[in-house]
From Swiss-Prot:
Top-level taxon of origin: Bacteria
Protein name: Putative ribonuclease-like protein YfkH
Cellular component, GO annotation: plasma membrane
Compartments (UniProt record): Cell membrane
InterPro entries in the record: Virul_fac_BrkB (IPR017039)
Lineage: Bacteria, Bacillati, Bacillota, Bacilli, Bacillales
Cited Pfam families: Virul_fac_BrkB
Gene name for this UniProt entry: yfkH
GO MF term (any one): exonuclease activity
Length: 275
């Protein structure tokens, strides 16, 4: 059986569409707690709310982005400072629900049962959520400080304007690298199976490139051809957001299925699940 045919067969057998819809649902529920947790941390960094939202804006459809910005600003403005500590914990717990759904989907891809305890699985999801937040924050800080770092390096080594141009391209090329790191971490840590980084890179690269392409094309389609606000009214932004999350879920699951299929075809010694 060809690789693509077997991949499609596994995706269908593992109910990939249903799993993608489940991921979209939990992504939507987790989005704003995730943003609130991340924006709380930016209070201690030279970053603004707009800097954080700008990362999402690179990929999110415009109609969905306006909804995200509106709800995020409203939530932050109405936040009770006295409940901040509890709010951070609650936001982190809620945001980890999205990661929890990914854990279940990737276990399904590898045909492994989840025999880790509820606490271990939840802590894994929380760890992945925190890791994603800090990875995104690093990506945000690089453009902020990157220009000054580039100038200092240029003065030190006596480089030309070409160096500054290349450095600028590197700084603004951080987003794909961040995505690759996030997807790689997901595929290594999330499944109940011991996996090394080199065995998950094919799926991580696929998910990274696919997500950038699909997000860009979907954003172009929504802004050019489809007017969801005219069709669905005030919930148009939510519909667009759910479709975007659904497409993202498909790519994440396909990336996991690619890794699982390659793992199976290479007939590697099967590692025992965590106990």
């Amino acid at each position: 059986m060809s690789f693509l045919k077997e991949l499609f067969s596994r995706y269908t057998l593992h109910e990939g569409q249903s799993k993608s819809a489940e991921l979209a649902y939990f992504f939507l529920l987790s989005l704003f707690p995730f943003l609130i947790f991340m924006l709380t941390l930016t209070a201690y960094l030279p970053l603004s709310t707009d800097d954080v939202l700008g990362v999402i804006e690179q990929y999110a459809p415009a109609s969905a982005m306006s909804l995200v910005e509106s709800i995020t600003h409203q939530t932050l403005n109405n936040r009770n400072g006295g409940l901040l500590s509890f709010g951070i914990i609650a936001a982190l717990w809620s945001a980890s629900n999205g990661m929890n759904a990914i854990v279940r989907s990737l276990n399904h891809a590898y045909d492994v049962e989840e025999n880790r305890s509820f606490i271990i699985v939840r802590l894994t999801s929380i760890f992945l959520t925190i890791a994603m937040v800090f990875t995104i924050l690093v990506a945000l800080l690089l453009p902020v400080f990157g220009r000054e770092i580039g100038r200092l390096a240029s003065d030190f080594v006596g480089a030309s304007d070409l160096f500054l141009s290349v450095w600028a391209a590197i700084r603004w090329g951080v987003s794909p690298l961040v995505l690759l790191i996030v997807f790689s971490a997901l595929y290594v840590i999330a499944p109940n199976k011991k996996l090394s980084l080199r065995f998950v890179m094919p799926g991580a690269v696929f998910a990274t490139i696919g997500w950038i392409i699909v997000s860009t094309l979907f954003s172009f389609y929504v802004s050019t051809f489809a007017n969801y606000s005219a069709t669905y009214g005030s919930i148009g932004g939510i519909i667009v957001l759910m479709i975007w999350f659904y497409l993202s879920g498909i790519l994440i699951i396909l990336g996991g299925e690619i890794n699982a299929l390659l793992h199976k075809r290479k007939k590697l010694p099967d590692e025992n699940p965590y106990h």
